[in-house]
Amino acid sequence: CALPISEYNKSVREFDLVTLDRVRRIDIEPKLSVWQDYARAHRLHPAVTAYLELRPQHFYKIENDVDGVQFVTARGWEDLSAYLQAADRLALPVDEGVIGQYLRHPEVARDFAAYWVLYRKYHEDYGVEDILQGKPYDAVIARAMDASFDERISLVSLLLAGLNTRFADARATGAVTDACYQQLRSFKRTLSQQPDADPADLFAERCDAYRAKLEADKTAGALLPDEAAARTRTLALLTAWSRSLDNGLDADEAFDTVRGAFNTQVQRREEAVSAASNALEFAFDFMEQAFEDGQEMVVFVNELALGPDSAPFLAENDCERFEQYSEKLLLHGGEDELLAELQRDDVRAEEHSAEF
C-alpha cells in the first residue's frame, strides 16, 4: 500500500489498525539522486540539475506559515525546466516572478532566480563556447581555479551542456544517415528486381511509403521524440533526392545520383562526430588545467558516463582520457561506496537486533 504524504494531498487518511494489519507498509521519501537519474534521462535543463546538486535541500519542501502552504516538488522543477528550455529558444523572460510560478516556495524561488543570473553570467564570462572550440582561455583559468565551489560546479555544468548539444547532434545525424543507408540498399535491390520500371518513379514510391509509415507511427504514438525527429529529417532528405531524379535516367545513373547525395550526408555525420570529439578533447584540456584531479573532474566524468547523449557517443567513439579518468575516478569510487553501504547495513542490523 502506498499513499501520498498528507501535507501534499489532503485526501490522505489514516488506516485503522485492522486494515494496517493486512497491508504491507513501505515508507517512501523523496530522494534527489533517484530523480537526478530521471532528469538526466529526460534531458532537463542543466541549470536545474546543477542547482540541485548544490542545493539538495531545496529539491522537495513543504512548509506552512501565516501566508499558507509554501512548497516545491519534483514536478515543479520539471515544469520549470521546460520553461527554461523554451526561454532559451524564444528569449522569454526569466525572473523571480516567473520562477515563483513553478517553485511555490518564495525562499527557493528567490535563491534559484539569483543562481540563474549567475549561471548565465558564467556562460558569458568564461566563454564556454570558446573553450569548446579550442580558443585561448588563459584569462579565465586563474578565475576558475580561485572560484567558489558553486561557481566551479556551474562551470562544469555549462561545459557539459555545450558538449551534450554536440553529442546529440552527432547522434541525430548518425541516425538519419543510417536510415538513409537502409533506404538506398532497398532502392538498389528494387532496381535489380524491376529493371523495366522508371527509377525516378520507384524512388518516389519509396518516399511515399516512408512518409505514410511515418505518419501512421506518429498517429499511433509509437515514436519517441528523438525517433520522430530523425525520421522526419530522413524523409526531408529522401524527398529532396527524389526531386533531383529526372525521368528517363537509367538504373545506374539514378543510383549514382542518389548515392552522391548520400555521400554528402555521410560527410555531415563525420563532421558532427569530429566536432563533438574535438570539443570533448578541448574540454578535458581545460578541466585538467583548471581542476586537475578535484571533485569537479569526478562530476564531469560521471555525467559523461551517464548522460543519454554522451554515453552512447563515447561507446561508439574512443576517448582515451575519458577511459583513463573513468577507471581512476569512478570505478574505485563505486567500490568504496558499495563497501560503505554494506557497513551501514551492518550497523543498522546491530542497532535493531534487540527488537527480535
Model-derived features: where do they sit?
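Conserved Switch II/interswitch segment of TRAFAC-class P-loop GTPases
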Residues: 6-7
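Terminal-proximal interaction/regulatory segments of ATP-powered molecular machines
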Residues: 141-356
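Conserved beta-strand-loop-alpha-helix hinge in the C-terminal portion
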Residues: 35-37
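Alpha-helical lid/collar subdomain of P-loop NTPases
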Residues: 41-201
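A short helix-turn-beta junction within AAA+ P-loop NTPase domains corresponding to the substrate/partner-engaging
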Residues: 12-33
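Short, small-residue-biased leader/transition segments that mark boundaries at the very start
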Residues: 1-3
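Short amphipathic alpha-helical segments, especially helix-boundary/capping motifs
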Residues: 10-13, 55-57
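Generic structural signal for alpha-helix starts
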Residues: 16, 45-49, 224
